[in-house]
From Swiss-Prot:
Co-factor remark: Binds 2 nickel ions per subunit.
Subunit structure and binding partners: Heterotrimer of UreA (gamma), UreB (beta) and UreC (alpha) subunits. Three heterotrimers associate to form the active enzyme.
Superkingdom of the organism of origin: Bacteria
Active site: H322
Protein residues bound to Ni(2+) 1: H136, H138, K219, D362
CDD domains linked to this entry: Urease_alpha
GO molecular function (one): urease activity
PROSITE patterns: UREASE_1, UREASE_2, UREASE_3
Protein name: Urease subunit alpha
Keyword Cytoplasm: yes
Family: Belongs to the metallo-dependent hydrolases superfamily. Urease alpha subunit family.
Cofactor(s) this protein requires: Ni cation
Length: 570
């Protein structure tokens, strides 16, 4: 007779299984395990007296004959594709298999072979997600990269050269010389990195040379002059070389209004940064473009979610970030035109219905690089409390809402920027850039961050202690953050044209250079998983009220948020 144990005892030993529910941090979001790939009674687990021992759950199979490098056991996978439990096998820095791990010589249904050369990571009671991607980075300070890594981000895309004033305001690495220096610098950091060139030009020559120098994308920013002519020129170069274009439109409406920008885009695919407008863009109605089928709209995290402090904070941030002076009335008017509680409130709802597709940081330039995940889940929690269950939900859980929101900082930015063949989801064949979370700390403080299958960061106690847990416990770089392991565990993304032109040999960098692809006509708003809605947006020019398909979008600011002070006492 098989031995029977209670669900509680089973969850305590092997983690939750099909039908069990897990609360995410201190939010009101509850996930339910949809499927468990294990064979009950044949689970593998590492430890004294446990299963992964020689002749038991560990086989004699060599790596050459199919054993994996690492197995993550009994993990709850939270991904855009579903919420399920499985073992994960890693090999050659990639996800080799998802399913049932063990010894095929004595266990049924094994598709992940554990051998003497296999390392074990205990996923029991843990959540595994794909590493996050932050697609709106001002590379102002290299220290941002460690901050982002420790928050669960494994890819950063943006522009800059350090604390130059152009970088403080705009996400552009201008010109081939600066792009080369940034690609060289990338070898020092445990992070997948990608750099954007400056897209503001009326003739294509300077833009073309930036793409050939390795830019994965081109950024149009109003501080450099986002005119209709510059928009058209930039998109034409992008179409020629298969790179994405990101746009920050003309707040002052000097060279045209939102309709003129839409006209200049001419139906071509484009990623619209901070589409609500507080981060910049046609005042007061840039938010309209989230209804365009060719526009991929995103948010930056300072407006996520709308709270009682959002408006006051933004005015001061904006003055600093855009080199404005509080003693100049025109500068104050410029700042005030961008900060509108009505459009920020509407942004919450547009995220919840899947009309906004991506959340990013805007690091040190009106955004916090370590809070992409936190702000995403705070928005999801606020919307559940204010709007209730989504109509797409099945069963007594929040699975669909969770899948919608995790897509905003994993798969969708990866698709938008031509990286989804490598990153963005927990999927066989993709890079093993994975994050383990204790559910109580989900989205706030990871348990472990893997880059290319190696541990790059984790909380760790006193290195002189007799065990790993004594205080002070804080995040520390792990072995994938050092030496050649660093350059073999992460990559730098570049354009295909730059690879074809011999960029790697020319720069002599150690990291693998990987080309972006399918950023233009092959994708659109419809490609944004769980976030592809294109409502018709109207903005009242006097009251700033926002309507989607005729429905007024409004909500109250939050006075209390989850995932906040409770988690940051020390």
């Amino acid at each position: 007779m098989p031995y029977k144990i209670s669900r509680a005892a089973y969850a305590g030993m092997f983690g939750p299984t099909t039908g069990d529910k897990v609360r995410l941090a201190d939010t009101e979001l509850f996930i339910e395990i949809e499927k468990d790939f294990t064979t009950y009674g044949e689970e593998v687990k590492f430890g004294g007296g446990k299963v992964i021992r020689d002749g038991m759950g560990q086989s004699q199979v060599t790596r050459a004959d199919g054993a994996v490098d690492t197995v993550i056991t009994n993990a709850v996978i939270v991904d855009h594709s579903g919420i399920y439990k499985a073992d994960i096998g890693l090999k050659n820095g990639r996800i080799a298999a998802i399913g049932k791990a063990g010894n095929p010589d004595m266990q049924p249904g094994v598709n992940i072979i554990v051998g003497p050369g296999t390392e074990a990571i205990a996923g029991e009671g843990k959540i595994v997600t794909a590493g996050g991607m932050d697609s709106h980075i001002h590379f102002i300070a290299p220290q941002q990269i460690e901050e982002a890594l420790m928050s669960g981000m494994t890819c950063m895309l943006g522009g800059g050269t350090g604390p130059a004033h152009g970088t403080l305001a705009t996400t552009c690495t201008p010109g081939p010389w600066h792009i080369a220096r940034m690609i060289e610098a990338a070898d020092a950091f445990p992070m997948n990195l990608a750099f954007a060139g400056k897209g503001n030009a009326s003739l294509p020559g300077a833009l073309t040379e930036m793409v050939l120098a390795g830019a994965t994308s081109l950024k149009l920013h109003e501080d450099w002059g986002t005119t209709p002519g510059a928009i058209d020129c930039c998109l034409s170069v992008a179409d020629d070389y298969d790179v994405q274009v990101m746009i920050h439109t003309d707040t002052l409406n000097e060279s045209g209004f939102v309709e003129d920008t839409i006209g200049a885009i001419k139906g071509r695919t484009i990623h619209a940064f901070h589409t609500e407008g507080a981060g910049g863009g046609h005042a007061p109605d840039i938010i309209k473009i989230c209804g365009q089928p060719n526009v991929i709209p995103s948010s930056t995290n300072p407006t996520r979610p709308y709270t009682v402090n959002t408006i006051a904070e933004h005015l001061d941030m904006l003055m600093v970030c855009h080199h404005l002076s509080p003693s100049i009335p025109e500068d104050i008017a410029f700042a005030e035109s961008r900060i509108r509680k009505e459009t920020i409130a509407a942004e919450d709802i547009l995220h919840d219905i899947g009309a906004f597709s991506i959340i990013s940081s805007d690091s040190q330039a009106m955004g916090r690089v370590g809070e992409v995940a936190i702000r995403t889940w705070q928005t999801a929690d606020k919307m559940k409390r204010q709007r209730g269950r989504l109509k797409e939900e099945k069963g007594d859980n929040d699975n669909f809402r969770v899948r919608r929101y995790i897509a905003k900082y994993t798969i969708n930015p990866a698709i938008a920027h031509g990286l989804s063949h490598e990153i963005g989801s927990v999927e066989i064949g993709k890079r093993a850039d994975l994050v383990l979370w204790n559910p109580a700390f989900f989205g706030v403080k990871p348990d472990m961050v893997l880059l290319g299958g190696s541990i790059a960061a984790a909380p760790m106690g006193d290195p002189n202690a007799s065990i790993p847990t004594p205080q002070p416990v804080h995040y520390r770089p792990m072995f994938a953050s050092y030496g050649k392991s660093l350059t073999n565990s992460s990559v730098t993304f570049v354009s295909q044209a730059s690879l074809d032109a011999g960029l790697k040999g020319r720069l002599g960098v150690a990291k693998e250079l990987v080309a972006v692809k399918n950023t233009r006509g092959g994708i659109s708003k419809a490609s944004m998983i769980h976030n592809d809605l294109t409502p018709e947006i109207e903005v009242d020019p006097e009251t700033y009220e926002v309507r989607a398909n005729g429905e007024l979008l409004t909500c109250e600011p939050a006075t209390v948020l989850p995932m906040a002070q409770r988690y940051f006492l020390f």
